[in-house]
Swiss-Prot record:
Cofactor: Zn(2+)
The family this protein is said to belong to: Belongs to the QueC family.
UniProt: ATP binding residues: 10-20
Cofactor info, note text: Binds 1 zinc ion per subunit.
E.C. code: 6.3.4.20
Designated name of the protein: 7-cyano-7-deazaguanine synthase
Purpose of the protein: Catalyzes the ATP-dependent conversion of 7-carboxy-7-deazaguanine (CDG) to 7-cyano-7-deazaguanine (preQ(0)).
Lineage, highest ranks first: Bacteria, Pseudomonadati, Campylobacterota, Epsilonproteobacteria, Campylobacterales
UniProt superkingdom: Bacteria
Pathway(s) of this molecule: Purine metabolism; 7-cyano-7-deazaguanine biosynthesis
One example GO MF annotation: ligase activity, forming carbon-nitrogen bonds
Gene (name only): queC
Length: 225
């Protein structure tokens, strides 16, 4: 039965929504989990709730707002840093990086999967078109899967079907799934939380790194597919 249940890290963005629709066609039961970590773009949680309702999938929010008190990121509400610069703790990373965020998310998803009797966790991470975050890479995902299973005596799989897809390929995947319109109009990616301006690729400020990646991907999708 556990092979038929999947727990998904769900932000309401392009990646995780495409993933949720993909998973709903492959698993008997899918559970969506969002995280409130005091992010500036908390509007994504509202989008996630609406999308979960549209997809008729159960959705839980886990509170992690303590993160802004123990580490640095320009994504936190208490930060006045402008997104687009180097991280104060590591100059090789963008300041939108939240240290250990994915490690925390995945650890909690792993615990929840055990409670549900699920043997699958699905993540919308990609190292093809990503924001320079090391915790989105395949080697990290494989390592934490191994570590958590060792620590829990489990065999839970972490599934990452978007790992080597570009944003353009993700738009094509959404089209193939019959969900392109939903991805464009309902998902949220913008770090600034902008939901007033609808571009061809979706809502957003059009300037932040997240919007730039999404815009570039959509333009490539239109040109290639």
């Amino acid at each position: 039965m556990g092979q038929e249940i999947c727990v998904i890290s769900f932000s309401g963005g392009q990646d995780s929504t495409t993933l949720a629709i993909w998973a709903a066609k492959r698993f008997k039961k899918v559970y969506l989990v969002g995280f409130d970590y005091a992010q500036k773009h908390s509007v994504e949680l509202e989008c996630a709730q609406k999308i979960a309702s549209l997809l008729k999938l159960p959705y839980e929010i886990i509170q992690l707002d303590f993160l802004e008190n123990i580490t640095h990121s320009a994504l936190f509400k208490n930060s006045n840093d402008l997104i687009g610069h180097s991280h104060v703790q590591n100059k090789d990373l963008p300041n939108s990086f939240v240290p250990n965020r994915n490690a925390i998310f995945i650890t909690l998803l792993h615990s929840y999967a055990q409670k549900l009797g699920a043997n699958n966790i699905a993540l919308g991470v990609s190292q093809a078109d990503f924001s320079g975050y090391p915790d989105c890479k395949e080697d990290f995902i494989k390592s934490i899967e191994h570590a958590l299973n060792l620590g829990s005596n489990t065999t839970i799989k972490i599934v990452t079907p978007l790992m080597f897809l570009s944003k353009a390929q993700e738009f094509q995947m959404a089209k193939d799934l019959g969900a392109l319109d939903l991805i464009i109009k309902e998902t949220h990616t913008c770090y600034q939380g902008e939901r007033k301006i609808l571009h061809a690729y979706g809502y957003g400020c059009g300037e932040c790194l997240a919007c730039q990646l999404r815009k570039k991907g959509y333009e490539e999708f239109q040109a290639r597919f």
